[in-house]
Amino acid sequence: MSDAQQITLIVDGEETKVTTGTTGAELFFERRDVVVARVNGELKDLDQPLPEGADIEGVTIDSPDGLNVLRHSTAHVMAQAVQQLRPDAKLGIGPYITDGFYFDFDVAEPFTPEDLKALEKMMLKIINQNQKFVRRVVSEDEAREAMKNEPYKLELLGKKNNAADAGEGVNVEVGAGDITIYDNVDRKSGDSVWCDLCRGPHLPNTKLISNAFALTRSSAAYWLGNQNNQQLQRIYGTAWPTKDALKAYQERIAEAERRDHRKLGAELDLFSFPDELGSGLPVFHPKGGIIRKAMEDYSRQRHVDAGYDFVYTPHITKGHLYEVSGHLDWYKEGMFPAMHIDAELNEDGTVRKPGQDYYLKPMNCPMHNLIFRSRGRSYRELPLRLFEFGSVYRYEKSGVVHGLTRVRGMTQDDAHIYCTREQMKDELTTTLNFVLGLLKDYGLDDFYLELSTKNEDKFVGDDATWDEATRTLAEVAEASGLELIPDPGGAAFYGPKISVQAKDALGRTWQMSTIQLDFNLPERFELEFQAADGTRQRPVMIHRALFGSVERFMGVLTEHYAGAFPAWLAPVQVVGIPVAEAFNDYMFDVVDQLKAVGIRAEVDISSDRFPKKIRTASKDKIPFVLIAGGEDAEAGAVSFRFRDGSQDNGVPVAEAVQRIVEAVRNRTS
């Protein structure tokens, strides 16, 4: 074989010579777990020839990218099954998502649970046929001919040149570069039995999907995520490399459903979502109010200790404030409509005094800037750390509102820090350490950081300032010792940010705190301080939300603890259960001693039998149950019963009180 017939590749870091035209499938023939190739950083189907000098990496089915390909291919098989069972179904979009996939369909009747079972059977039949996924590059005319009976696909072809901004999931189907169609090809006849407009890549064949998949639910969804468009039916599913992995995922989902904060909120009488108030507007019941107050009180004290100044701002403002801040230019769709008020009319109906537009506050930062600007500021006052539990209102679409974690009315634990450029690095370091320490106090301790950097097409300020700020944030993040994940181009237009990602008890990731530099608002509000040399200078502005919102954080903690809050947060910390009515007075005396030292305690004097009272305390997830009978009363003692069912008998009352006080003070249990 001559050199002319060979090309050189870098395969998994090593130089390799192969025959011209070699495909990924041939290169990784002996590695059955490789399902696509990463070629110069881009994922490619295994049947594509590899170019000279390319850097090649085999992507396995159990890797993050491999799982995405598996799920995308399973979505295609599901769509094929739908059109076999419902030939009138029109195809929408079908991307992979976290842990699964979905596909949208325009159908006459919504899908039922029985339909999903029938679809799973049809999918297994397709999978066992070992159909090949074959990529085909086509012209736009050829694509339109192939998709002539698919109106939504024809619409997507018209969006090819602006796919990134065209709507939900469009760039999975079309985008820059070639137009491609993927055929599902019958292994025996070689004929295409189904096809879809898609950018890929896909598995080599359907057999690799095996039986480790499941269709999980169906729901309504608007075409391209726009509520003004046609309503379609969406089927969700999941797929994994093995049946064991699928089972483990299903067990995690079942546990997540048991921990769902909406379910626990009702069971534990913490909060509710009355229809009379509207979507995304929760109310907190007395027990939920206790938890929320304990969360806020602890945070408030920690902020005082860290040198923050508390401020309060109103819920509404004249619209001009958000013209100055730019929110009406950049964020109006996320705001509630204006209230036009204060107009005065003459008797004949003519306007004597024009009215003004007022808005519900979506952000606290413009008002905090007014506080900073309310008088002259000196460098000696900096850093100035303003903090507020500020109520804000955002017009979230009803389809994305979800329990406490996505609401329309929320309370942000919002801080804005003003400092000199020389103070910026130390202040960012202090802020990040403060954030991580406080989150740990609430029971979250598994973190990584994400650094969002400049979007080259959408930013204010100069490159040098952005570069310095980004470099400083990166240094601060790296010094924390936590994993740092880059988010290229993910920053808001006004500055780079660090976001703290926290994992809960189920291993799910939640974005918690953000630390955001802002080059925009100090300019817009003309914020200044007098520097040591007498000149007027702009302060560096740092936005910092620790919980995100109190509501969202409470939802996260409810699921993290499965409703079994640590004693310091629990609405009822102790329940006393006398073994018989004769010992009620004794138990009331014990509970009074606990109340005297600030413990939330009560006695169960219901008519229920003793075993039922124990079960009730367990169901209500009470941290400590104190039990007293004759021997306890004579000895001045109680029996401790813990959440795990273990029990410590004959504990002197004074010791019991001290144990509970220490557990609450130390935020344990």
Swiss-Prot record:
EC number(s) given by UniProt: 6.1.1.3
Domain of life of the native organism: Bacteria
Region (Catalytic): 260-566
Gene Ontology CC: one annotated term: cytoplasm
Keyword Membrane recorded: no
Enzyme class: ligase
Enzymatic reactions: tRNA(Thr) + L-threonine + ATP = L-threonyl-tRNA(Thr) + AMP + diphosphate + H(+)
Binding site for Zn(2+): 365, 416, 543
Predominant place of localization: cytoplasm
Cofactor note (record): Binds 1 zinc ion per subunit.
Required co-factors: Zn(2+)
Keyword annotations: Aminoacyl-tRNA synthetase, ATP-binding, Cytoplasm, Ligase, Metal-binding, Nucleotide-binding, Protein biosynthesis, RNA-binding, tRNA-binding, Zinc
Chain's role: Catalyzes the attachment of threonine to tRNA(Thr) in a two-step reaction: L-threonine is first activated by ATP to form Thr-AMP and then transferred to the acceptor end of tRNA(Thr). Also edits incorrectly charged L-seryl-tRNA(Thr).
Record text on subunit structure and interactions: Homodimer.
Similarity comment: family membership: Belongs to the class-II aminoacyl-tRNA synthetase family.
Protein name in UniProt: Threonine--tRNA ligase
Origin species: Arthrobacter sp. (strain FB24)
Gene from which the chain derives: thrS
